[in-house]
């Protein structure tokens, strides 16, 4: 199935010169959404994964059904102030400065094998911060999976030492 047919490209959103890749049409089509989830789960099935981790918000949309498909748990990565218990955090660079991500300090146990799932790999800042937190907790990043990679933004460089899968590529 060609999943690129289920991605809407919106020019000049959220600002001039940017083409936003909207996954809403993919999620609205049960067959395409299910296919994408199964493809990621298939990638993970031989990696002995213990936990799926996904950054907010679209990482939840993809990561949770992957975790269900694999029969394992899901741990959310959130912005500061959104998680109620003790957290670990990691800073990452955005286009106009630094931002921070957090996850519960007890979300990953030492030695657990983790699959990071998100909708988009662009510059790699989000996934790099997520990797940092997982490893700080003693987890092992067994793989990363993304619906879309924006080529030319060097996101692959951030995960060059990790196994990963991308279902679709678009110009960055």
Swiss-Prot record:
Record-linked Gene3D superfamilies: 3.40.50.2020
Pfam families: Pribosyltran
GO biological process, one term: AMP salvage
CDD domains named among the record's database cross-references: PRTases_typeI
Keywords linked to the UniProt accession: Cytoplasm, Glycosyltransferase, Purine salvage, Transferase
A GO CC term assigned to this protein in UniProt: cytoplasm
Catalytic activity entry: AMP + diphosphate = 5-phospho-alpha-D-ribose 1-diphosphate + adenine
Cellular localization per UniProt: Cytoplasm
Pathway(s): Purine metabolism; AMP biosynthesis via salvage pathway; AMP from adenine: step 1/1
GO molecular function terms attached to this record: adenine binding; adenine phosphoribosyltransferase activity; AMP binding
EC number: 2.4.2.7
Function: Catalyzes a salvage reaction resulting in the formation of AMP, that is energically less costly than de novo synthesis.
Family from the record: Belongs to the purine/pyrimidine phosphoribosyltransferase family.
Cross-referenced PANTHER family: ADENINE PHOSPHORIBOSYLTRANSFERASE
Quaternary structure (record): Homodimer.
Protein name (Swiss-Prot/TrEMBL): Adenine phosphoribosyltransferase
Biological source species: Streptococcus pyogenes serotype M1
């Amino acid at each position: 199935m060609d999943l690129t047919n289920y991605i809407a490209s919106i020019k000049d959103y959220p600002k001039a010169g940017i083409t936003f890749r909207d996954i809403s049409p993919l999620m609205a089509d049960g067959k395409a959404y299910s296919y994408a989830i199964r493809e990621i789960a298939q990638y993970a099935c031989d990696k002995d994964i213990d936990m799926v981790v996904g950054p907010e918000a679209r990482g939840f949309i993809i990561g949770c059904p992957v975790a269900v498909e694999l029969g394992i748990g899901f741990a959310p990565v959130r912005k500061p102030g959104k998680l109620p218990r003790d957290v670990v955090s990691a800073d990452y660079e955005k286009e106009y400065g630094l931002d921070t991500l957090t996850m519960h300090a007890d979300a990953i146990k030492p030695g657990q094998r983790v699959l990071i799932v998100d909708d988009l790999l662009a510059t790699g800042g989000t996934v790099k911060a997520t990797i940092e937190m997982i490893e700080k907790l003693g987890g092992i990043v067994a793989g990363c999976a993304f619906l879309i990679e924006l080529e030319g933004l060097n996101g692959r460089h951030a995960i060059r030492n990790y196994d990963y899968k991308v279902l679709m590529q678009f110009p960055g």
